[in-house]
Structures are given as C-alpha cells and as structure tokens.
Design a protein with these regions (language model features):
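Short, charged, surface-exposed loops that flank catalytic or proteolytic processing sites
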Residues: 146-155, 219-229
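Glycine- and other small-residue-rich loops at beta-strand/loop junctions that grip anionic moieties
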Residues: 10, 76-77, 111, 203
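Conserved N-terminal subdomain of the carbohydrate kinase-like
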Residues: 1-6, 18, 22-108
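Conserved phosphate/ATP/ADP-binding segment of small-molecule kinases
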Residues: 113-190
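Nucleotide and nucleotide-moiety/phosphate-recognizing core
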Residues: 72, 83-96, 167, 181, ...
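Charged C-terminal helix
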Residues: 52, 225-280
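Short pre-catalytic strand/loop immediately N-terminal to key active-site residues, enriched for Gly-Thr
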Residues: 7-13, 191-204
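Short, small-residue alpha-helix embedded
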Residues: 19, 24, 141-142, 201-224
Length: 280
C-alpha cells in the first residue's frame, strides 16, 4: 500500500487537521502516517487554543516514521513555529517523493496560525521544496501581499506564489463570488478546476481534505494535473455530503459513499473515469 506522511496539527473536533487528513487518505486507498506539530482545542465554533508540540518531539516523530516506514509523499499543514518548520525542511530535503504544502496560515476567524519567523521560513525554505502548494485567497495575501478579489486575479495571485519556488500552485478560489473555481498552474500551463457551488455551511476541513487527496493521488503515481482533478472531485463530493455537528460549521464527509445521500446537483467538470460516486 502507498504511504503518505502528514505533518500537521490535531483538531479536537475531528473536522480538520490530521483527523481530516487520515479520513481522506483512507478513502483514497493509501496508508497515512502522522507527525503532530500542534494540539488545538477547537470545535464547530472556532479555535479556542493552540499548543505547539516541542520540536524534539516533532523531530522524533519524523525520524520514527521515515527511518522505518518510509513514505511515498508528504503533506504538510499547520506547522506553527519556526523550529518546527526547520525540522520539516531538514527531514524532507532529499526525499524522492512529492511534497504538498497546505500553508494553513490563518484560522477561520482570521487569527494567524504561524509566528512571523515561521512564516518567513515557510516562504524561504519550505515552499521552494514543494511539488504543489495549495493556498486559499487569504493565504496568498498573507504570503505575497497580493489580493485576489475576483476570478481575473487568480493568475496574478498564483504567479506571486510561484515566485516563492514551488513547482505548481493550486490556488483555491472557493470564496470568490460566483461559481467556485480553482487555478492549477506551473507558470506555463493554466487549468481551471470548476465545481457547482453547494449551499452549505458545513465545510470544516475542506482545505485539509483537498491537499491530502492530492497527496494521495500523487503517491499513487498520478501526475500533478491528474491528481489535482481527482482531488477537486473528491473534495466537492465531500462538501456536498457535509453534515451538521455542534452549533457552528460542521465537517465535510470524506467517506460519504458508505452513507447514501442525495447526489450533488450538477456534475463536477473534472470527473475521474471509472470512479463510482463519492470515491477517491
């Protein structure tokens, strides 16, 4: 079985972070291993506390996984502190498999999840190693200063991200007005990934799910455009199956094929041939 190493924070509510990553990886048919970088106290109403895991513990987890189990791809999420970012850079430098970086720079309420030093190191040392980086609009602004306010700004925002060194950018435009559209580019080719907008507030874990599905397909041998298309379809169906949990925004549902529900209205324009509904 193919392996994906996730380096990210824990979500006590189970909707995002490594919890969402592991559900996604299982649904996509790969084995997920984890390095916990931070523990968060969060639920459907928001993030109520963040505690960084000591960097020695982060390094020990990285060594334990990589020295014995190995990995076919790495996906990073919330890294929090500069020492943790450096530990990840040290561990992934020279690894042969793809690296997916989800910058996870801001909470849903807009609170920063990286220290200023960590953010600088992310720009300077981790992003140049990335096969694909998957920022949302707020993270593009945080990392580059470029504001993406409409679909016409997507190329400019993605171009600014490419200047930081990743090979590909998958810029998530779900918060733009109109039809949700993401832009995948390596600076030479540009592909728009579209899906119908789903009228729901139950979207917790969307970014983690997309990035982990992308990493899973890369680990299974897909090229970046194929993996991005498959990940887009997977997350679109997970959003359509999102469910209420708690008093706020509920999570997306990565394993909805086990729990039938009304189909997604319309069809995602990046269908993966031969895959049944709600599969990865």
């Amino acid at each position: 079985m193919r392996r994906v190493l996730v380096v990210a924070g824990s979500d006590s509510g189970g909707g995002a972070g490594v919890q969402a990553d592991l559900k996604t990886l299982l649904a996509c048919g790969v084995h997920g291993t984890t390095v916990i970088t931070a523990v968060t106290a969060q639920n459907s109403l928001g993030v109520h506390g963040v505690w960084e895991v000591p960097v020695d513990a982060v390094r020990a987890q990285l060594a334990a996984v990589l020295d014995d189990l190995g990995t076919d791809a790495v996906k990073t999420g919330m890294l929090a502190g500069a020492a943790t970012v450096q530990a990840v850079v040290d561990a992934v430098t020279g690894l042969p498999g793809p690296l997916v970086v989800d910058p996870v720079g801001l909470s849903t309420t807009g609170a920063p999840l990286h220290t200023p030093k960590a953010l600088a190191l992310l720009r300077q040392a981790l992003l140049p190693l990335a096969t694909v980086v998957t920022p949302n609009l707020a993270e593009v602004e945080q990392l580059t200063g470029v504001v993406v306010a409409r679909a016409g700004d997507l190329r400019r925002g993605a171009g600014a991200m490419l200047e930081l060194g990743p090979r590909w950018v998958l810029l998530k435009g779900g918060h733009l007005p109109g039809e949700p559209v993401d832009l995948l580019t390596d600076g030479t080719t540009y592909e728009l990934l579209r899906a119908p907008r789903v009228d729901t507030r139950h979207t917790h874990g969307t970014g983690c799910t997309l990035a982990s599905a992308l990493a899973a397909h890369l680990a299974r041998g897909s090229d970046v455009p194929q993996a991005a298309a498959a990940a887009k379809e997977f997350v679109s169906r997970a959003i359509a199956a999102g469910f209420p949990l708690g008093r706020g925004a509920g999570p997306v549902h990565q394993v909805a094929e086990q729990h039938p529900h009304p189909p997604l209205a319309g069809s995602v324009s990046v269908n993966v041939r031969g895959k049944p509904p709600h599969s990865c």
